[in-house]
Amino acid sequence: MMFRLTSVSCFLLVIACLNLFQVVLTSRCFPPGIYCTPYLPCCWGICCDTCRNVCHLRFGKRATFQE
């Protein structure tokens, strides 16, 4: 009976650790100057191909407005 209780406890502990690692790994973010996407967000600031405080307007023939 003691062996079964220990095995179940270890199994539950492993599941809890895996859930914790999943939360830590999926909630990562990137500092300024690093490439970003909507799926790989910036820690602070906004994503304009790279993490920045402010997006600048691009001038020229193919100017685009970025929020």
Curated annotation (Swiss-Prot):
Q: What does this protein do?
A: Inhibits the vertebrate voltage-gated potassium channels Kv1.1/KCNA1 and Kv1.3/KCNA3.
Identification of the protein by name: Kappa-conotoxin-like 2
Record propeptide residues: 63-67
List the source organism.
Conus vexillum (Flag cone)
List the coiled-coil residues: none
The alphabetized UniProt keywords are: Amidation, Cleavage on pair of basic residues, Disulfide bond, Ion channel impairing toxin, Neurotoxin, Potassium channel impairing toxin, Secreted, Signal, Toxin, Voltage-gated potassium channel impairing toxin
Which Gene Ontology MF annotations are present? potassium channel regulator activity; toxin activity
Which residues are connected by disulfide bridges in this protein? Answer: C29-C43, C36-C48, C42-C51, C47-C55
Pfam families registered for this protein in UniProt: Conotoxin_I2
- List every position bearing Phenylalanine amide: F59
Hey, which family's this protein in? Answer: Belongs to the conotoxin I2 superfamily.
Please state the span of the N-terminal signal peptide per the UniProt entry. Answer: 1-26
Q: Where in the cell is it found?
A: Secreted
Q: Which GO terms describe its cellular component?
A: extracellular region
Please give the chief subcellular localization of this protein.
Answer: secreted
The domain-related comment in the record is: The cysteine framework is XI (C-C-CC-CC-C-C).
Tissue expression, per UniProt? Expressed by the venom duct.
